[in-house]
Design a protein with these regions (language model features):
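Conserved N-terminal catalytic core of the sugar/cofactor nucleotidyltransferase
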Residues: 1-13, 19-27, 32, 37-126, ...
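Left-handed beta-helix
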Residues: 2-7, 209-211, 215-369
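Short coil/turn connectors at secondary-structure junctions
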Residues: 6-8, 56-57, 79-80, 107-110, ...
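Conserved beta-strand scaffold positions in the cores of enzyme catalytic domains, especially
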Residues: 33, 83, 143-145, 268-271
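Residue-level signal for inorganic ion chemistry
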Residues: 44, 99, 118, 160, ...
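A short acidic, often aromatic-flanked loop/helix-cap motif at beta-alpha or helix-coil junctions
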Residues: 89-94, 152-154, 186-188, 278-279
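Residues that recognize and position ribonucleotide moieties
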Residues: 113, 205, 280
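Conserved core of the sugar-phosphate nucleotidyltransferase
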Residues: 124-246, 268, 346-347
Length: 369
């Protein structure tokens, strides 16, 4: 094993509801706890399994207190010391920053890696090779992001513009990062795709914990002070009291704003291209595509397959009740049947599910969220 890997401590921020996957994904059963690819595992479990072999048996999960039981049921071997529970959502900088601070307090020379709980990645061995290259690069004193080669001019992701190769032994594909670009419009995204100089920012990064905290202190001093106070009490009897007093005072901000973008401007960020298949499973169109690619079938059925009567339809049906669902002669449909809500839409409008959720909120139907 490369010596840098002995310092590697991955963490998984497991948050967010996934509103474009409503009514299947809810606050009490969010996207990352679901099996959306018919693998037999949740997205969280698959993420954990990809990382555990690289980590000397220690992967930290950061999630909301309401998901603690579900997380430990899905990952029964997760150590209590590796489960960080947030009393309320505070965005990615607080979640990742606190995990980073706890790891750094325990192991000052640790290299952390942050990987979202709800992505689909294959093949696993290629992902692990890329992460190893990122860890080797991070050991030289860099924050390393993993850039995904764009397959379309998407306006749903941020972009990374890289420059010269850094020539790091053991990490031949590493490049310096010039800038992070916010989610562009479709025309600009097409220009990025045509240039071949940009990769998608998938929110995966590897870095020395000390370097992450250095940039967090410089750019978000109030947030830094709060998470350090919590981290210093974490492995003591004072944890709950300090968490209760400090957590709600922390400012909300994303890790890209708090660390990645200013670190790139300071020349501290590198990029390793992700030469693997990646999908953030952002809507039901993605769920249908991923399952169809695996099964070769035109209609994906999640849930109770015997409850679906299909006559020449394609798309996706989620059958989460005992009700029988009969569909006839419809192409590229989305049907999601749950005990208290039913969604019907064409796959082409899968992104608009978020608008439907907005209407549910506006009507005060919080029990459906």
């Amino acid at each position: 094993m490369n010596t840098a890997l002995t310092r590697f401590r991955p963490l998984i921020p497991a948050g967010g509801v996934g509103s474009r996957l409503w009514p299947l994904s809810r606050a009490h059963a969010p996207k990352f706890l679901l099996d959306l690819t018919s693998s037999g595992n949740s997205l969280l479990r698959d993420t954990y399994d990809r990382l555990i072999d690289l980590s000397n048996g220690s992967v930290m999960v950061v999630t909301g207190t309401s998901h603690a039981n579900a997380v430990t049921q899905q990952i029964p071997e997760l150590r209590a010391a590796d489960l960080v529970l947030e009393p309320s959502p505070k965005d990615s900088a607080a979640a990742i920053g606190l995990a980073c601070a706890i790891i750094h307090r325990r192991e000052p020379d640790a290299i952390i890696g942050s990987f979202a709980a709800d992505h689909v990645i294959s093949p696993v061995d290629e992902f692990q090779r890329v992460v190893t290259e990122a860890v080797i690069t991070a050991a030289t004193g860099k924050i390393v992001t993993i850039g995904i080669t764009p397959t379309e001019p998407s306006s749903a992701f941020g972009y990374i513009h890289a420059s010269e190769s850094l020539g790091i032994e053991g990490a031949p594909n590493t490049h310096a990062v010039d800038t992070f670009v916010e989610k562009p419009d479709t025309t600009t995204a097409q220009k990025y795709l045509n240039s071949g100089e940009y990769t998608w920012n998938a929110g995966m990064f590897v870095a020395p914990a000390a370097l992450m905290l250095k940039h967090l202190e410089a750019n978000e001093p109030e947030l830094y002070a709060g998470i350090m106070e919590i981290a210093n009490a974490w492995d003591t009897p004072e944890r709950e009291a300090v968490m209760e007093r400090v957590w709600e005072t922390l400012p909300k901000t994303a890790i890209d704003y708090a660390v990645a973008e200013p670190a790139a401007a300071a020349g501290d960020v590198a990029m390793v291209p992700g030469s693997f298949s990646w999908d953030d499973v952002g809507d039901f169109d993605a769920v249908a595509r991923l399952n169809s690619e695996k099964s070769g079938e035109q209609l994906t059925i999640l849930g109770e397959k015997d409850n679906v009567i299909n006559h020449g339809c394609s798309g996706i049906v989620v059958a989460n009740t005992e009700r029988k669902i009969s569909i006839i002669g419809l192409d590229d449909i989305v049907v999601v049947d749950t005990p208290d809500a039913l969604l019907v839409a064409p796959r082409s409008k899968a992104q608009a599910v978020k608008d439907a959720v907005g209407e549910v909120k506006a009507r005060g139907l919080n029990n459906l969220l």
